[in-house]
């Protein structure tokens, strides 16, 4: 389970308003200064944007898991718009394969070289779709961005 602390959030330069909201909610639940707080608490008290931001404020021993979670979230978000590309290019599977490769990479089942090849293929799909409806090109680009995020 990913956690953070008040100290880590401050060290990561948390937005003052969001930090105060989170701190007030967590103090009411009994959390103290350096006590680990599950990140799902940030989701409950502050919403998705702040919970995603709080991923940067996890202890160093949790960074590998944090990176995996961030990569898988990127895949989930890219899949949510993939239908826009596939509606215009139903036979072009490059963006879908890109997302699948990013998932496998996050789970340790794909090499970085595979990830780079998938990124290049999705970027090619986005380029090929440049003259198509904007939503299709954007969706293919999102798949490429997913792989980029998975590799960083």
Q: Over which residues does each language-model region extend?
A:
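Short, glycine-biased loop/turn motifs at secondary-structure junctions and
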Residues: 1-152
